[in-house]
Swiss-Prot record:
Disulfide bonds: none
Subcellular location(s) of the protein: Cytoplasm
SUPFAM superfamilies: Carbamate kinase-like
Gene Ontology MF term list: ATP binding; UMP kinase activity
One Gene Ontology term, aspect cellular component: cytosol
Function: Catalyzes the reversible phosphorylation of UMP to UDP.
Enzymatic reactions: UMP + ATP = UDP + ADP
Name the UniProt record assigns to this protein: Uridylate kinase
Lineage of the organism: Bacteria, Pseudomonadati, Pseudomonadota, Gammaproteobacteria, Moraxellales
Regulation: Inhibited by UTP.
Keywords from the UniProt entry: ATP-binding, Cytoplasm, Kinase, Nucleotide-binding, Pyrimidine biosynthesis, Transferase
Gene: pyrH
Amino acid sequence: MAETNSPRYSRILLKLSGEALSGNKDMGIDAQVLDQMSLSIAHLVGLGVQVGIVVGGGNLYRGSQLQKDGLVGRVTGDQMGMLATVMNGLAMRDALVRRNIKTRLMSALSIGTVVEPYSSRDAIRYLSQGEVCVFVAGTGNPFFTTDTAACLRGIEIEANLILKATKVDGVYNKDPSKYDDAVKYDNLTFDQVLDEKLGVMDLTAICLCRDHNVPLQVFDMNKPGALLSVIMGEKEGTHVTK
């Protein structure tokens, strides 16, 4: 256990993949998973941690097959993916509001009265007031992943830590679901991730974190208490630093 009862990190950026929101389903949002995620985030807010969230959209739209079949272009496919993140963000916002957590949904794309436009200045102000900010539509541009969007938003809001929630409990030297002898890393440097091609995030995302010296934590969001353990500075998942 950590020696202090105070959170180690005061402001974080949490990246939630669309696949994580789908739970054991092939597609869609698992209500139980969404509810549990909102509870975990509410616990952090109760401790005074300022929370920004970037959500993916892979549980609602996967464009690779449509693009492969030539039915939609890459730009259109990426834009469809951005809209999928908006739907996930709406669900996350309402799940948090249901727990009496003030939450702002901010989009990199202009979507009229549905979502307010993203502004780093406004986001920092909301976070400082104790509100959760859910960032959707990625970077607003095609060809950039939501992992890159998460690192970009984390840097912009001056987060102390960027967390990537996955379905495994950290980073391994090879796929633990395929290889019994896979070895988990407790600590890594960004250069190690790049040199060993560990696939933590895409190249652009990792380079952003490295160049701006923002640490990254990879952990299993489905493990009870894992998110809280990370925030309290306990050993959980894999910590990546410069």
